[in-house]
């Protein structure tokens, strides 16, 4: 092989490798989605189920802030992205101690895209509640709760 061809091929290889090194796995300039809750404020469905099924356990206050079935013991508020439901939610909070464990869930869709979780969470924070948990439903209530056989409120016609 001629030395010129070897040099040209070497140049092409070096050029191609340098281009590859400049690419990134994530788009540059797009901010990551942030949420008002911290990771330690997420509650796994299995953990809530354990609380609900423990004998003589201290039960949290659970709010269903969506339009899906009620988890056992949940207070059904409805979609809090609707102003009257948000006001009803605030009324329900008036006689609850600020340190009480409160768990909120919607379950209509993945909670990270839910139009109800953030308004409810921010309302709780604004009102001074200190023990807030968001039920981690990455898909929806049906997949992450009901399909696992966790308890629903049987007094409501589900």
Predicted feature residues:
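Flexible, polar/low-complexity N-terminal or interdomain linker segments that lie immediately upstream
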Residues: 14-71, 153, 158
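Acidic/glycine-enriched edge-of-secondary-structure segments
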Residues: 70-84
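Second-shell loop/turn segments in exported
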Residues: 32-39, 76-79, 107-111
């Amino acid at each position: 092989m001629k030395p010129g061809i070897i040099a040209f091929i070497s140049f092409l290889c070096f050029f191609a490798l340098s281009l590859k090194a400049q690419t990134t796995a994530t788009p540059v300039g797009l901010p990551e989605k942030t949420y008002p809750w911290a990771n330690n404020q997420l509650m796994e469905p299995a953990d809530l189920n354990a609380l609900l099924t423990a004998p003589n356990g201290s039960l949290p206050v659970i709010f269903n802030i969506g339009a899906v079935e009620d988890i056992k013991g949940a207070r059904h508020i409805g979609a809090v992205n609707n102003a009257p439901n948000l006001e009803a939610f605030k009324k329900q909070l008036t006689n609850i101690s600020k340190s009480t464990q409160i768990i909120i869930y919607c379950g209509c869709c993945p909670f990270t895209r839910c139009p109800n979780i953030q308004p409810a969470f921010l309302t709780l924070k604004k009102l001074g509640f200190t023990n807030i948990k968001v039920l981690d439903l990455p898909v929806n209530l049906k997949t992450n709760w009901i399909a696992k056989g966790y308890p629903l409120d049987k007094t409501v016609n589900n």
